[in-house]
A protein has these predicted regions:
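Short secondary-structure capping/junction motifs at helix and strand boundaries
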Residues: 82-86, 146-151, 185-189
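Extracytoplasmic/secreted envelope proteins and their assembly/folding machinery
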Residues: 133-137, 174
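N-terminal export/assembly leaders
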Residues: 119, 136-165
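An acidic/polar, Gly/Ser/Thr-rich interaction patch typically located in mid-to-C-terminal regions
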Residues: 37-65, 224-334
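Assembly/oligomerization scaffold segments
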Residues: 1-121
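Short beta-strand-centered interaction patches in the first periplasmic/extracellular domains
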Residues: 106, 113-115, 152-247
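Alpha-helical support elements that line or immediately flank enzyme active sites
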Residues: 126-131
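Short, charged, solvent-exposed linker or helix-capping segments at domain edges/interfaces
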Residues: 120-124, 211-214
Length: 334
């Protein structure tokens, strides 16, 4: 379908070899077999994934006996040149296999970015003395083996950190970095995710302050209004609210206030740091011009952002003992 023919958000075009299954028996074009294609892209997930619903009348499932070696090539978009997703995925699961008729069946094929499979099969045990942004780049290039064109954006982080990645998967380590990194405004809002442009490591503040790439249309479609062609290209069927107000949950999870307790095993000193929601909130940019941070006084006439014992985070004793034993062995070796 050419660019000029696209007028509705429900329309799309499949480029040549747009939905191709690469198997040990060769390439199979699924353009005439798939009934539904769903691609999941979220800033809260490390990589892209999805499902494709197949109506199989040629016994493809029996011939292939899916074993994880299959790759799905997707080249699809609103037009041939706009909003195109061009990427290869790994088939990792088959489910919901149902007989439709005597000679036909339907099933779901689940796919995920190939880096996820590599991450599940790998681990990182390494000490770093660098910024979190440089650590992220090292993991992406040397452990997930990503070329530069697959790394879309890595935002610079503040400070040099000494950390040890403790024999965990690359995606676990990237999540570890995102939870601890801060930008130059000391905003702890880093996220690691993948979209159609590649892998990203940046802050919510930067995304909020950036100019919108497109506008989503929630209105009824195909109204025939003038100058409505652009709005029709990108639409949403519905909005799902995934998080709602829960005061008790916010208190116990340390949203309003908390206390960090750190133990230095070399000096045997204990350090405490109070963390206030108002303090952290001020470091980040926000979508609302008049943000509501939810400050109120409790029965003791104290602001909820000053109740630092609501949640305390501290190092577990078992890790301290383990690290102390490792330190003793290192001293003996010296």
């Amino acid at each position: 379908m050419s660019d000029a023919q696209i007028t509705q958000s429900s329309q799309y075009t499949i480029n040549p070899r747009g939905i191709t299954l690469v198997t040990k028996l060769g390439e199979i074009n699924l353009a005439g077999m798939f009934q539904e294609l769903t691609i999941f892209d979220s800033i809260f997930n490390p990589c892209m994934s999805g499902t494709v619903l197949i109506q199989d009348a040629v016994g493809l499932s029996n011939k292939l006996s899916f074993d994880g070696s299959e790759t799905l090539l997707i080249d699809i978009g609103k037009t041939e040149n706009v909003a195109v997703i061009k990427k290869s995925f790994r088939i990792f699961k088959q489910s919901s296999r149902t007989s439709v008729s005597s000679g036909s069946e339907m099933y779901l094929l689940h796919f995920v970015s190939d880096e996820f499979i590599l991450s599940q099969q790998s681990s990182i045990s390494k000490a770093y003395n660098n910024s979190y942004s440089e650590i992220v780049k090292d993991i992406l290039k040397n452990y997930l083996l990503l070329p530069d064109d697959k790394i879309f954006f890595v935002e610079q982080t503040k400070g040099i950190r000494k950390i040890i990645l403790p024999n965990q998967t690359p995606f676990w380590c990237l999540d570890f970095c995102s939870k601890r990194a801060v930008d130059f405004d000391l905003s702890p809002t880093f996220l690691f995710f993948e979209n159609k442009l590649g892998y990203n490591f940046n802050t919510i503040s930067r995304m909020i302050s950036s100019f919108p790439t497109h506008f989503i249309n929630y209105q009824p479609k195909n109204l025939g209004l003038e100058n409505n062609e652009r709005d029709e290209l990108l639409g949403a069927k519905y909005v799902e609210v995934i998080t709602q107000f829960d005061l008790n949950k916010n208190i116990k999870s340390g949203v309003y206030a908390g206390k960090f307790i750190g133990i230095d095993i070399t000096s045997r000193k204990v350090y405490e740091r109070n963390v206030s929601f108002a303090e952290m909130y001020a470091t980040a940019k926000h979508a609302n011009k008049t943000p509501n941070i939810g400050v109120f006084k409790n029965k003791a006439n104290i602001d909820n952002t000053q109740m630092f014992n609501s949640r305390r985070v501290w190092l577990q004793l078992v890790f301290l003992v383990l690290r102390a034993n490792i330190l003793k062995k290192m001293i003996l070796l010296l």
